[in-house]
Amino acid sequence: MIGVAATRVENRVFAALGLQKSDISFDSCESVEYGGVLFLLPFLLANGLLSYKKYYSQRHSGYYDFDSVILTLAFMYLCRIKSVEQLKHYSPGEMGKLLGLDRIPEARCLRGIIKELSIQERACEWNAYLSEDWIDHEDTSIYYIDGHVQVYHGHLANLGKKHVSRQKLCLPGMIEFWVNNADGLPYFYVTGQVNEKLQEMITTQLAPRLLELTNGKVSQQELDTDELLPRFTLVFDREAYSPSFFRHLWESFRIAVITYRKNVKDKWDEKDFSAYDVDTEVETTMYLCEKDVELNGVKMREVRRLTETGHQTSVITTNYKLSTILIALYMFSRWTQENFFRYMRQEYDIDRIIQYGVDEIDKTTMVVNQEYSNLTQRLKKLREKKARHQAKLYALVTENIKGEMEQTGKNIEKQLCFRQEIELFEAEEQEILAQRKQQPYRISIDKMPEHSRYNKLKTESKHLQNIIKIICYRAETAIANLLTAHYRKGSNEIRALVKSIIFTKADIYPDYKSNILTLRLNSLATPRDNMAINEICQTLNDYEAVFPGTKLKLVLKTATVTPARDQEV
């Protein structure tokens, strides 16, 4: 048994003998499931999907080469098939038609080929290459940084607990620190080892990597000429707030920051705020005010936004080149990165554990001592008990002063009981403090008890597949941006329309004489959608994308051509 839809028997026999790989050959087909996914192929290739070849060695034998597997994974994720296991429930022959094959790899075969890629351990290098290419083409100097926790519910790994804001709980997991642009498009991410804080990761990994990727975008001569010019600007939330940290970034790297200010006590006069018209998805008005401020000896700019309720949201920055309105816009655009995390969780299942197994952590890594933390927790609970007893004692003393003489005896007895318990609490408190004093606050991993010693999940395969998911997201965004131009208002429905295109059947017609692969998309749900997709076909065809492994140029068409109307879609 070769398998369902395995029609190219001779090729498979030759591949099994190591004589040849699969040939990419398209047949004329009508109404192919998920045919619309090929509309995203030009953007997948433009975003570097096949640039993996610069870092990964190709397979020497086997029916499927790495190109077919990478394309299979990309199409799989775009079709919202979130794991290799789920492929078992989809027609392998229909998916194979999209790749010019008889069928896609069986789940076990696909896992094996992914493992062949993963053991080469080149995901970080590939991601670095892609990041540099994207940054060069997008020409941005604003980078958004935030952590995303991948919650772990298993028992194999001992992971430190992280605060998961979306669940408002501290749970075991691994934290990924992502770098995105102002539109939410991701560049790269770094996985923390244990419980690293955002400040630490920016200093040790994210800032050095961004400096390397942006090397030369701002020359040293420009920096020397203009003392206020930053290399680039980082935008993050209050987690990394620290004026001394901001000074370190500026003095050591010439990196500016934009973030929310913590512990704002005062209010500015509302008469100082001016109205600014802001054009986002809809035109809105912001009431802003800017003043210079000095915090812990660090001079910064503070911009506040006045809301309708009278609340003043404070934003601070060390960037003196941006206008007031841009500072506010960049800070309040952080929601694009949050939306990216939510979309990737829901649509691409980015938190899924892909590779089982654990790796050891560098034994010299310093972590918070669990014994110290346990004693601190005991001390906190004990002090809470003592505070409650002191409050009750105070109430009894007050009652005794104001009460009647007949109740004084009973009242004093109760007071005595509370005083005795408080004394016991104080004695226990001193004992815990003495025990905690003997424990160091931080210890190295190798000094942790073996049964609770931290380790980490294997990440190479997940990193590889996350890169493909990032490219898929960027391809989706690119076609969504094209569609937005043909609508009166940009809306969240654009993403739904892109999904609708992907899920729509299409006809495939190869012409090997002219080296053209024509894809004709079936009708979408509404004339408005048909008109929009028909309008962007020429733009997509201008990319002149050639299907990988062939000389066939992709030509995209729609089956329904809606006549132009006066009204705007």
PLM regions and their residue ranges:
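Dynamic "connector" segments at or just before major functional cores
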Residues: 1-169, 174-227, 430-569
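C-terminal, active-site-flanking charged/polar segments
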Residues: 256, 323, 331-367, 422-425, ...
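Extended alpha-helical coiled-coil "stalk/arm" regions
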Residues: 389-440
